[in-house]
Amino acid sequence: MSLEIVQIFINDATKAWFKTAIRNKMKINNKFRSLDDVAKICLNFKENNKKIVLCHGVFDLLHVGHIKHIEEAKKNGDVLIVSLTKDIFIKKGLNRPYFKLEERISSIAALELVDFVIESPNKTSLEVIRKIKPHYYVKGQDYKKISLDKTMEIKNEIKMVDSVKGKVIFTNSPMNSSSK
């Protein structure tokens, strides 16, 4: 799907909704936290035998494939954390990301299944994995074939998850990409 077609569907009313959500801090106050805050909160959850699930990505142009991925991820544990890549690190083409980080945070935070949303301080999720120490790190099936990983980071992510005694899970949700 081309960016022009997507822009038709993302009209001014949609953008206005996102901006209003940000201004009103709709759902963000309770869900959007710093990485360090969520890492501390996770310690308490782990002490209470709660399973921590972590997803990481851009989540620009949130679509049904993202939703199914998040639904499938949540089934693996009690607490679902979604970390987002900062705008400066996104290389998905001209005029991308379409939605700025704050808008992407609002979209993800609005999903009931998501417990916390954090921004990754770096280009990769390695620091997030190291600090959160999730029981499960969930990636989409498009990362299952490691040799096809466009980011070339999945190998490092798997090593980091192993180092914190977690498990990598690949969802079976159908692939839908907003950057293809």
Name each model-derived stretch.
Residues 2-180:
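Nucleotidyltransferase catalytic core that binds NTPs
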